[in-house]
Amino acid sequence: MNTTKFVAVLAAAALVACSDTEVGPTAPERDALAAANGPAVASASGGGRMVLEVFGFTIPQVLGFSARRHADGSASGHINYRQTFEGETFHFVATVTCMAIYDGNRVKYGGVLTRSNDPTVPVGDYMWFQSIDNGEGEGSPADVSTGSGFGSEAENEAFCASPESPDPIFLAEVIGDIQVRE
């Protein structure tokens, strides 16, 4: 990871860490979850800042996530996401319920919202993302991610289960880092 990416990841982590809301399960809760579901057979994590330019809108976002798929097929982890739209900042926290890796470097993950300050997307709804790890080092293109999708549990599970690649219009460069491991 180059120095610029490393500093950006640290800055994003500091923003998430300084949040006044919880970002996911505590270390003992994560350990208990991993023990109950078996070892992770695949994982993805990372985040950073993104700016999505879509349909004439500029939407600044901060994403941080950790997702694991376990030997029994279940998924665990957390997602912490902020987006600013037309001057209002929305913050969402979710517990990961699905995760799948495609093409070796592309991860789809989603989960149930445990925190939301957006009255149109309440706790109990689901959100999902697709992120691409484009490698490390000088000359590697930036990692990219979609903005969030929101909907029902069935839509969340269908999203993770579909190998379909993201529409490039919904991808933004991540100023940070995404790691995908199988």
Please report, for each region that a protein language model flagged, where it lies by residue.
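Extended soluble regions of mature proteins
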Residues: 119-122, 128-152
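Bacterial lipoprotein signal-peptidase II cleavage site
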Residues: 19-26
